[in-house]
């Protein structure tokens, strides 16, 4: 969809113009994805101006680019066995709180399986559950979770990590709030826990945007509306 401000001028769609963008991964932008003839992804480039690309050099651990999955658009699929994409550190260092994530994905289907995590033990993460049950779990030192989790559909989630005032929205509606802890985010891992070989999840990931601020309601709604329309959610 285009964002029209007058009949003769188009502006770039969100998230351009909203300050604080540190990571933007878009599965619908083929120019940002390096894949082989079997559609195995070795690198997914960041569309922000930060250069926070994620990669996987081991061929057997590369996720799969799959076309036409959501609203006719491709996604990146992780197998829940050994797939991951990662970056050891963000340009500019650890992202501290408050920070805001917009993620369009299908959550992993097994408990203690990770969708997005950080590279260190003092980390932020999004996972399907704790060590004993399937839950929607956002964590930055303290579990903030709910058993109301959808592992069947690609949905939009908006996460604000802000200590005791952390929150999550699902499909543009309030979903979860409370204390998620105060950890920052050092680097990023998709499809795996922070330590190698553990917590592999099987998310389908369509798009991720991470900001190093708590966005205003207006900016949050602008990005949510953009992603909802783009991905047919």
Where on the chain are the PLM-derived regions?
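Beta-strand repeat scaffolds of extracellular/surface proteins
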Residues: 7-8, 13, 24, 28-30, ...
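Extracytoplasmic/secreted proteins and extracellular or luminal domains
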Residues: 17, 95-96, 181, 186, ...
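Extracellular glycan-interaction surfaces
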Residues: 47-82, 92, 101-112, 117-183, ...
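Predominantly extracellular/luminal carbohydrate-interaction, adhesion, and secreted-enzyme modules
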Residues: 186-197
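A general structural signal for short secondary-structure junctions and capping/turn motifs
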Residues: 12-17, 65-68, 91-95
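GGW-centered surface loops in extracellular recognition modules
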Residues: 2-53, 104, 207, 215, ...
